[in-house]
Amino acid sequence: MIKAQRRILAGWLFISASIGCGDVTSEQQTTGSNIERLFVLRRTVWPSQDINVCWDSAGFDSEKNWVRSAVERSWSLVANVNFANWGNCSAGSNGIRITIDDVGPHTGGLGRDIDGVVQGMVLNFTFSSWGRSCQSSSDSRGFCIRTIATHEFGHALGFAHEQNRTDRPSTCTEPAQGEDGDFTVGSWDLNSVMNYCNPKWNGNGELSSTDIQGAVLMYGLAPSLTLASLPS
């Protein structure tokens, strides 16, 4: 079913493109009307719509719920991908394993390359050492946690940094970071949540039309949506 949706959506995207006339800004990672590009590493796209998520760190129940809510209101809202469970990790847990640490948030790779990897994703909830501007208020801390979660789960779905693209404009001066993708949709997207050159930090955690279209192309359309409901 997912493969069939991808074939349909690939045709839709092609037609649409044809007719279309202190350091909180840094992240450590080891790894309009026109349709724009999203940068994806295809071999890392998860084969199942159900992706297990678990926590290797205890506590922070409220913050963990903020992360889950941010993901469910972004990637899971538009694409046929279900981040499931969200409980504590066990020794043999697969899927996305999240550690909480006061360092730059990052993933250990893209997509399913982090399947079952301890510290496959690292998120920061305290900002005592890294990203201290996120401590300025409780609202700021919540905003940072949610916005970063949306970005990092983009990596967990297989999406690379947009500024890594070789055809980025000269106005984008952020250095390439992490692993590159091997597939693009449309043209370079300033507004992607995966783009460090986005004038809004991590896109304020709000998926651009490109982010949405790329996620749907890779994973299929969320069951509650129709193609007509997606941004053009």
Could you tell me what each predicted segment is?
Residues 22-232:
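Zinc-dependent metalloendopeptidases
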